[in-house]
Amino acid sequence: MTKLATSINRLAFDLFPKLSRAQPGNLVFSPASISFALSMTWGGADGQTAKEMQQVLHFESSSSEVMEASGKLIAALTDRSRPITFRVANQLFGEKTYPFEPSFLSQTARAFGAPMQQVNFKTAHEPTRRLINEWVEQQTENRIQNLIPNRGVDSETRLVLVNAVYFLGDWAAPFDKQRTQPNPFHLSPSNTISVPTMSRTGSYRIASKDGVTALELPYEGNDLSMIIVLPDAVDGLDAALSSMDETRWRELTNGLSHESVWVSIPSFKLEPSAPMRLSTPLRELGMRTAFDRRNANFSKIANPPNPQDRLYISE
């Protein structure tokens, strides 16, 4: 799983600058979720399509090995014995009249727990869209609604692959709500606002390197954590983001060690926004053929006799 984690982190740092340019302001996305979904698709790709996907996803093993490692990682993340809730749900929604390859369906079901639900895109695509959105809402405790917008699928849709991630956890060392108070927060060197700020003193793992400081905040159970990276300079955010990659991230996090730390961070809430369009950044990274209707090769997912009915990724 270590190789897979490295691949996911590399994809994260490839995508982050492209997504942040396309969506100014705060940005939240799950590189693991993207990797899981695309690895299922890669397992059904062949030829140039598969080659480009493998390079962009930084996979160094065979598709079967990546799928097996992904399944093990998902199982580790969703261990129900932990005091936190972490769900990773995968599902395939396929046109009931389409000739999907049984080997692909069994592979995704075995590795990802992603069975195929047969649906009617051809003549009932709008009810099917609502069905998929209801499934996502159920898996995410209604946090993600209307994932597929109006006209997001049509009568030509043959397969929708959905990956939903839901996390709920408390800090291992909770912040006292009564100590939350307004404090200045620097949006930029010239723009400071007042925000509710929570604070506490405790023993945390912390590291400083190359103009940034990383702080690890563990969740209850201490198996999962959030790592916050803060530039040392008020105007250092752009430089920190542009220089960070998987190698520097690994060096920074490998240097984490326990110290007594006064932690002061803004109260924040993560909420889903409009769905991100990944086609443009993935094309820019080199995954072009998968989005090309004429040249995409997903013959291991399905190989219909009519070339016009072959699969490609639309979004």
Please place each PLM-identified region on the residue numbering.
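C-terminal, non-catalytic macromolecule-binding modules
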Residues: E246-E251, L282
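Acidic/polar, low-complexity extended loops/arms that serve as protein-protein interfaces
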Residues: L241, R250-E251, H258
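Non-catalytic, conformational "gating/processing" segments within enzyme and secreted inhibitor domains
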Residues: S63-V234, N254-E315
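Extracytoplasmic/secreted cell-surface and envelope-processing proteins
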Residues: T49-M53, G236-D238, P272-A274
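Flexible propeptides and autoinhibitory/regulatory segments associated with cysteine proteases
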Residues: M1-E52, S63, Q138, N142
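Short, polar/flexible loop-turn hinges at active-site or ligand-entry regions and domain interfaces
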Residues: F59-S61
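Short Gly/aromatic-enriched secondary-structure transition segments
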Residues: M53-L57, F175-P184, D238-T247
